[in-house]
């Protein structure tokens, strides 16, 4: 019956016939009702809401859950060090790993140089 003018024409509209046979114009709402993805904290596995969300090394945390693995001190984005998915305050990171000079040894893993030594021994025995 009537037509929208100007920028309103870009808005999608649907025609519906009333019981009297006359057509009416209904505009869809400009916002969508998309389902929001629930993000979970990497430390406590509970839902993280936008106001308490913190992202470090592509992992999502609550502000209160982002703490040192060794002393449980609350960390900030400028005061942490990460190793193999674990987060530490800088003093404990240095205490636990830097003094040894080998990060893998601090985690109980084989040293990188040992992995190379095994490959050389294996390749030497196969050629003989």
Curated annotation (Swiss-Prot):
Location(s), subcellular: Cytoplasm; Nucleus
InterPro entries (UniProt xref): LIM_LIMD2, Znf_LIM
Record-level Gene Ontology MF annotations: metal ion binding
Domain LIM zinc-binding: 39-99
Keyword terms of this UniProt record: Acetylation, Cytoplasm, LIM domain, Metal-binding, Nucleus, Zinc
SMART domains: LIM (SM00132)
Presence of the UniProt keyword Acetylation in the record: yes
Gene Ontology CC terms, in alphabetical order: cytosol; nucleoplasm
Subunit structure and binding partners: Interacts with ILK.
Designated name of the protein: LIM domain-containing protein 2
Species of provenance: Mus musculus
